[in-house]
Amino acid sequence: MKKFIAAAALSVGLAALAAAPAFAALSASVKAPEFVAQASLAGKEFTFKLSESLKKGPVVLYFYPGAFTPGCTIEAYEFGEAMEEFTALGATVVGASGDDIAKLHQFAADNKACNGKFAVAVASPADIKAYDVAGRAETRSNRTSYVIAPDGTIMSTLSSGEPTGHIANALLALKAWRERNPITPAAATK
């Protein structure tokens, strides 16, 4: 009887894992889709355009499920704390979720989240689909970070439900890219 119960529990557990959404994401070395969205930096609205930001250097575009959820708040805070490192590497950081712009204004300015240090943008269902980050609902993404080179090629992808690890992974990818593409005095003055 105990073996039967153990086998049944194992079967239920495996079925639950099979039913859980798998994190699919765009692979490294593919071109990132254009991303144009309403965004907020420190509570101030603007239009974010990936192709324009890439003219200035690499972009870390990270998708998260929802503003003010525990994991997303931790992740945003950690990105904010690392902004000096991202800036030194010439990178722009922007978070994206299916939240509306009013909520993102609050999240962008909140000192326990973005703290005004980087922008967050509204990811439409089409954006979520294009970046292959759909969560349980088409308006919510899973937690996926993309590091995108100035030519629009994805250098690194990390899909993980854990809020930790995304910042370190992005910084490693940017440091490796920067070693191959050093900042020259002429480039620094542009």
Which positions does each model-derived feature cover?
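Short, internal strand/loop/helix patches
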Residues: V94, F107-N142
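A short beta-strand-turn-helix
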Residues: V36-P58
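Short active-site neighborhood of thiol/selenol oxidoreductases, capturing the structured segment around
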Residues: L50-T73, Y77-F79
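N-proximal helix/coil linker or "cap" segments that precede and/or mark the start of modular domains
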Residues: L14-A39, P185-A187
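Short loop/turn microsegments at loop-to-beta-strand junctions
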Residues: P33, P58-V60, N142-T144
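Thiol-/selenol-based redox modules, centered on thioredoxin-like
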Residues: R140-K190
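Bacterial N-terminal signal peptides that target proteins for export
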Residues: M1-V12
